[in-house]
A protein has these predicted regions:
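Helix-to-loop junction immediately C-terminal to a conserved catalytic motif
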Residues: 33
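Conserved ABC ATPase "signature" region
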Residues: 94-111
Length: 190
């Protein structure tokens, strides 16, 4: 349960949320990402107080990207089809060119025809990250994005997040990893 909580995150900030299991880290992230509504209180995003359902859809579609610990991919589809989902609302663009760019960005250039179930956990998380890159969102919410990964893949995924942040993206991530949280601009401890 999160009670009497006030938080302001500036554009381009890299924020870690840490705390014990059950402290509300994921709940806070989901409230900020408009995936859950708070029981009470206000949410103000880009000067919009308590966005209505239409505003929430626009924010989620156009401004927010989500990176979940469980990857949220369609396992029996190939990488390319999973990535096309992120391009659903982008018209008049070369989808293949954008997909190739996103896969190159995460080190999976030749993986577009591979089925998701053929990939390791680290590769699946990088596909999920490529999907976020394709959305060209302003804010990325990441819930334990490296929690299921070995050190090599953890470092790859985190380096990509840091690179996105250096290019102006706001990153808010939940982690139990002290080493990763220390690399954030700010750490919020619940």
């Amino acid at each position: 349960m999160i009670d009497k909580f006030n938080l302001e995150i500036s554009k381009g900030e890299f924020v870690a949320i840490t705390g014990n299991s059950g402290s509300g880290k994921t709940t806070l992230l989901n409230i900020m990402g408009l995936l859950e509504k708070p029981n009470s209180g206000d949410i103000i995003i880009n000067n919009i107080k308590n966005p209505n359902s239409k505003q929430i859809r626009i924010l989620q579609r156009d401004f927010y990207g989500y990176l979940f610990q469980n990857y949220a991919l369609i396992e029996n589809e190939n990488v390319e089809n999973n990535l096309k989902i992120a391009l659903k609302y982008q018209k008049n663009i070369n989808h293949n060119e954008k997909i190739n760019y996103a896969l190159e960005s995460v080190g999976l250039r030749k993986y577009n025809k591979k089925k998701i179930y053929e990939l390791s956990g680290g590769e699946q998380q990088r596909v999920a990250l490529a999907r976020v890159i394709l959305k060209e969102c302003e804010v990325i919410f990441a819930d334990e994005p490296t929690g299921n990964l070995d050190k090599k893949n953890r470092d790859i995924v985190f380096d990509i997040l840091k690179s996105l942040n250096k290019n102006g993206k706001t990153i808010v991530f939940v982690t139990h990893d002290l080493e990763l949280s220390e690399q954030a601009d700010r750490v919020i401890k619940l």
